[in-house]
């Protein structure tokens, strides 16, 4: 008896905290300051949703370390698997198709994911976001 193939199964298992290289916002004509292009993208969607969904919620990363003091910008230390020091811009979350996730880079440790979760919640609340360095 042959094994039935579940149409929802993916060829690889995507987990919350995984960082992949892939395209982000390629189809849109975006303004300055909005992340787009081929870059590190961090999966922030829950593992339960990742098992069945054909798309995932992600946070774009950048190697341009500008506005590092913002509460929604999380700068990572040098992590094996990422080519450069990376900052994730949690206020710019988006959705990508799992087929667009190209190269697996690494999985972030729980302490960094707590910071990412907090920054995403700050961005979602729409509260006035202050700079950690200047307080403005």
PLM region spans:
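Compact nucleic-acid interaction/catalytic patches
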Residues: 30-78
């Amino acid at each position: 008896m042959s094994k039935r193939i579940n149409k929802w199964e993916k060829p690889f298992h995507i987990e919350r905290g995984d960082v992949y290289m892939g395209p982000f916002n390629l189809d849109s004509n975006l303004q300055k300051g909005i992340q787009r292009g081929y870059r590190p993208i961090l999966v922030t969607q829950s593992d339960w949703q990742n098992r069945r969904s054909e798309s995932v919620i992600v946070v774009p990363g950048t190697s341009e370390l500008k506005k590092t003091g913002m509460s929604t910008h999380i700068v990572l230390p040098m992590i094996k698997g990422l080519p450069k020091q990376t900052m994730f811009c949690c206020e710019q979350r988006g959705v990508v198709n799992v087929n667009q996730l190209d190269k697996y880079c690494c999985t972030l440790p729980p302490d960094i994911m707590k910071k990412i979760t907090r920054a995403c919640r700050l961005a979602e609340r729409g509260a006035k976001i202050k700079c950690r360095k200047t307080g403005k």
